[in-house]
């Protein structure tokens, strides 16, 4: 056993996991269960009563958090300590939404003034674009933004921009390109006019393969329209740490926005990477997004463990992953605007906690990051919810829904809510054989047929879920929701004693991909790799199977 699993706290939880009653019984014997196991914070409401926990189990989970020194680790992150030890970096995405009078130091320097100076620069940039002051090379105002990035510099801005569609100013269209597959870029370029398009390139190094390839092709397309190299400065801006490469490309240094190495890509939407969000919803709404996240930061750092929303959600995930062998976790958004969140949370959690080495390099002997997946309610109810209800795997679920719709049309929203709440009840309650048999009592089936069909209609229930509600989807509540999942992810990493802020698996893929690229473009047949890779490379060169 590792030092994580060989603790009294861990062993106590293991013991509790083997003797819990069904949730039906837990609700039947405690009429106050919902009141005891629900929580409001930062414009969000969490009902975690439909989980396989008792007050005793929760107490043991909080003891596990104390044993892992969770509160000290939280404080260390917010203080700017080097908690990303493998890359020797602070982890300070939280500083990007800190108030302007905060003091957060990296290497003895307060980074908050630079953060707010960048916000002011973003505000001026947004104003010049949306007011029509910024003009393209033919004198026309900008109408379209093409944001080129990959990973966190793509997914975060795209999902947030999509979620905040009710707050779009209507002055611009925004298109996102990430995949190096040319089709992604080509199809977007069909929608825009080079005279009125601004390209925003986001890459810390200005050398990320996919992003640079797409940006170079976008520039070629732009120049083929009749523009000159000097005109590039009027149609390209960048978010990067490499100012020299950006200016060599043709971008005006005034339109280069900074990135810092103490912000990981999957946490970067709060930085200038979020520029597309600000362009689409305006600075007031963008600042409200930051304020919502800041409110969750304040809750996370100040609330006691037993009243701390990210802590509770993170510990519940550990509970199921390590004591019930849950290998995946589903996120179900009952709001069309939030349909992209499962993919965003997938990247956040799986890139952060998909690790097999502990902080000291010891190999873990327990499960770490689960597979995060999900989709939009009610669509999923006619597809994969079948697996949730009657499959053999335990899959904890998060249901997310605003109480008020931005589009209150007829009975749509009340039906949506009834489905959301009905699903959580069905997962918890299930259906017994006796209940299924009673439902068939009035049918014309024989007794044997009734018995057979009843067995097929049995649902074990006892399937755990959280329900997250908000009054209405706003920039502030969205900011709080995303920060909630950020901190939930961190809590899990602390319990497991892993580094949630590096991504060496991603780096290996890049390295090997570059090696294969060199072989794909070489003249001779591939022979230096394994037989499968060699054969695939040679097939690609031939262009046919």
UniProtKB/Swiss-Prot annotation:
Pathway listed: Carbohydrate biosynthesis; gluconeogenesis; Carbohydrate degradation; glycolysis; D-glyceraldehyde 3-phosphate and glycerone phosphate from D-glucose: step 2/4
Catalytic residues in the record: 351, 382, 510
Q: Which Gene3D superfamilies match?
A: 1.10.1390.10, Glucose-6-phosphate isomerase like protein, domain 1
| Localisation per UniProt entry | Cytoplasm
| Entry keyword annotation includes NAD | no
Q: Its catalytic activity?
A: alpha-D-glucose 6-phosphate = beta-D-fructose 6-phosphate
The organism's superkingdom is given as Bacteria
Q: What does this protein do?
A: Catalyzes the reversible isomerization of glucose-6-phosphate to fructose-6-phosphate.
Question: Which family does the record claim for this protein?
Answer: Belongs to the GPI family.
Protein name (database record) = Glucose-6-phosphate isomerase
Per the UniProt record, the lineage of the source organism begins with: Bacteria, Pseudomonadati, Pseudomonadota, Gammaproteobacteria, Alteromonadales
């Amino acid at each position: 056993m590792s030092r994580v699993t060989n603790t009294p706290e861990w062993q106590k939880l293991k013991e509790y996991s083997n003797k819990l009653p069904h949730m039906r019984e837990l609700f039947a014997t405690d009429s106050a269960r919902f009141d005891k196991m629900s929580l409001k914070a930062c414009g969000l409401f969490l009902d975690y009563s439909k989980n396989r926990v008792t007050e005793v189990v929760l107490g043991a989970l909080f003891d596990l958090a104390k044993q892992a020194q969770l509160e000290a680790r939280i404080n260390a992150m917010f203080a700017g300590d080097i908690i990303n030890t493998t890359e020797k970096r602070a982890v300070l995405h939280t500083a990007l939404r800190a108030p302007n009078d905060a003091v957060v130091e990296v290497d003895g320097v307060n980074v908050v003034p630079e953060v707010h100076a960048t916000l002011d620069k973003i505000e001026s940039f947004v104003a010049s674009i949306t007011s029509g002051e910024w003009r393209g090379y033919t004198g026309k105002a900008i109408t379209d933004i093409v944001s080129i990035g990959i990973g966190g510099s793509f997914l975060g801005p795209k999902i947030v921009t999509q979620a905040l569609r009710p707050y779009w100013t209507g002055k611009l269209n925004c298109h996102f390109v990430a995949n190096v597959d040319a089709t992604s870029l080509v199809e977007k370029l069909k929608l825009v006019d080079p005279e009125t398009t601004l390209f925003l390139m986001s890459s810390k190094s200005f050398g990320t393969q996919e992003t640079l390839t797409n940006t170079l092709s976008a520039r070629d397309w732009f120049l083929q329209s009749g523009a000159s190299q000097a005109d590039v400065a009027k149609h390209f801006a960048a978010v990067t740490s490499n100012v020299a490469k950006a200016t060599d490309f043709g971008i005006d240094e005034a339109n280069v926005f900074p990135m810092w190495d103490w912000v990981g890509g999957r946490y970067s939407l709060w930085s200038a990477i979020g520029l597309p969000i600000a362009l689409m919803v305006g600075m007031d709404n963008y600042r409200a997004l930051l304020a919502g996240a800041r409110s969750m930061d304040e809750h996370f750092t100040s609330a006691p463990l037993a009243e701390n929303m990210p802590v509770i959600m993170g510990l519940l995930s550990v509970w199921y992953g390590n004591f019930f062998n849950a290998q995946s976790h589903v996120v179900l958004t009952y709001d069309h605007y939030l349909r992209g969140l499962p993919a965003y949370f997938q990247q956040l959690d799986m890139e952060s906690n998909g690790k097999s080495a502990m902080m000291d390099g010891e190999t873990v002997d327990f499960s770490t990051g689960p597979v995060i997946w999900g989709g939009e309610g009610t669509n999923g109810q006619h597809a994969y919810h079948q697996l949730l209800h009657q499959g053999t795997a335990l899959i904890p679920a998060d249901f997310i829904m605003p109480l008020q719709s931005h589009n209150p049309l007829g009975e749509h929203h009340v039906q949506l809510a009834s489905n959301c709440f009905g699903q959580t009840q069905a997962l918890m309650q299930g259906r017994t054989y006796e209940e299924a048999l009673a439902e068939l009592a009035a049918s014309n089936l024989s007794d044997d047929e009734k018995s057979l069909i009843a067995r097929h209609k049995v649902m074990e229930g006892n399937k755990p879920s959280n329900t997250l509600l908000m009054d209405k989807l706003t920039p502030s509540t969205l900011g709080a929701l995303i920060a909630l999942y950020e901190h939930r992810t961190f809590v899990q990493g602390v319990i497991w004693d892993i580094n949630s802020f590096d991504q060496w698996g991603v780096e290996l893929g890049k390295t090997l991909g570059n090696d294969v690229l060199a072989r794909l473009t070489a003249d001779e047949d591939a022979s230096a790799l394994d037989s499968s890779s060699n054969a695939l490379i040679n097939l690609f060169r031939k262009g046919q199977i």
